[in-house]
């Protein structure tokens, strides 16, 4: 009636699979004990050892599942005739899969009890601001609380994003009740409080950014130790001047997009520092500066800075 249109940038998947953590998130937890490492790696070790022995694990790792909507011909054949995985070709695929998982595990990609889901603000607070004109809306979620329907009320959740360079392990309390389920329960998003600094810690906005939400008692305990006295980093980022759009400006923008934003050298330097036997206050300060440089580099094509 009003000639309005809506555009979906990203659509939430019907099925969200379990995720793997990465080395950047693990390297900032610098005081893990050998016993804790053994517990954290247990799921990945069991998964690797069960390839070819456990039917369900084997099929899942080969992508032969009902929720895989884009199966290859090989996967379709296995769905029709599962015994095919005993064929020589299938055995070769399993060997390569196992080799890949071992390589990933050595590189810090470990199986965890978590998944990636969209980040969303407290939309109840947004409605208070938008429709009621409240300049400081209260919302439903308090500071330190999140809502994610895939977890129970009272669960402690680690909320993580990549790139993860500084110590960015916010642990939040999941809150669920009838009122919260009514307002937030239609999606699998993780909803964050408008009173919380979590958006500053993780450097996210709400235009399709995703978060790795983990429920793990050991990782949570380690993270709490390492997050003691850690406050969010804050720095003013430069902004590009406004220009009239023309072919030349569009061309220069595309050129910048393909030639800027190489954060690899910066993040590699951060990893080298975290790899030291003992992390001193001076090294933490250097990591803070490099983290800022990394974020400036990521947005350099937009800000025309650096």
Which residue ranges define each predicted feature?
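Short hydrophobic-aromatic micro-motifs
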Residues: 158-160, 211-214
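Short beta-strand elements
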Residues: 131-132, 210, 216
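Feature representing long, continuous alpha-helical segments
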Residues: 212, 232-235, 292
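Short active-site loop/helix that positions an aromatic residue
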Residues: 200-202, 213-229
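Short, conserved aromatic-histidine micro-motifs
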Residues: 226-245
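Conserved small-residue
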Residues: 1-201, 221, 240-306
